[in-house]
Amino acid sequence: MTAIHLRPRTDWGTFLRQPTSYGTSHLGIPLEIWRPSGTCELLIFAGIHGEEPETTYALSRALRQLTEPSPHCAVILAANPDGLIRGTRGNARGVDLNRNFPTRDWRPGTVTHRSTIHDPSDVLLSTGGHAASEPETRALISLIETLAPKAVIALHAPLACIDDANASPLGERLAKRTNLPFVRDVGYHTPGSFGTWGGERGLPVITYEFALASTEQQMHDHVPVLVELLTNPAF
């Protein structure tokens, strides 16, 4: 295939093309996707936890460098825009979207998370009134059923690892490229998570966890990798 040329840095302040909508959030904000020019082989999404904005920043910077659509990769910059604009891990209804997917282990109730990586996991959020109770969750499920990507990369922070339950070649290459540990799980149970939902459906899901670092360090470390993922189907 012909290599995708990158825009000059002076043009990185804006998007060359506009996204389409695949739904709306609880607050009515469009859920946006940049679709590939060809068959969707890979979906990369960021910002399902609004308190992890560095994932959105990095993926946005990578996407803004392209002169044309990715040939193979769909991009979602903010799977939880309500949480992103409010600075909360959950959505506007206080639901952790990454515990709201209809998995065999989903349970109603609350789930905890850490306020900072150094604190105990004691901050409460809801898992939702029922599995897939949230519009953001349902929209992402419907989108994936339509796109039928061969794999999904979910961007998170700050656990500093490549989490791939399938130990796939793509996950292994990503770990080598980023110098992040390659693990089969993050060390604790995640009922109702997107990764579990994908696994139950035979959809390979790789969780790309950024390390705890300054924003500029994050951009330095991860934007070039994301550009490669967007432009090179053989990554």
Predicted regions and their residues:
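Short glycine- and acidic-rich boundary segments immediately preceding or forming the N-terminal edge
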Residues: 1-33
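Conserved beta-strand scaffold positions in the cores of enzyme catalytic domains, especially
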Residues: 19, 33, 75, 152, ...
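A residue-level signal for conserved active-site and pocket-lining positions in enzyme catalytic cores
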Residues: 28, 97, 208
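Active-site beta-strand termini and strand-to-loop segments that position acidic
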Residues: 34-38, 201
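Active-site/substrate-binding loop(s) of hydrolase catalytic cores
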Residues: 39-43, 52-186
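Glycine-rich N-terminal segment of FAD-binding domains in flavoprotein oxidoreductases
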Residues: 46
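Active-site-adjacent mobile loop/cap segments within catalytic or ligand-binding domains
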Residues: 164, 190-235
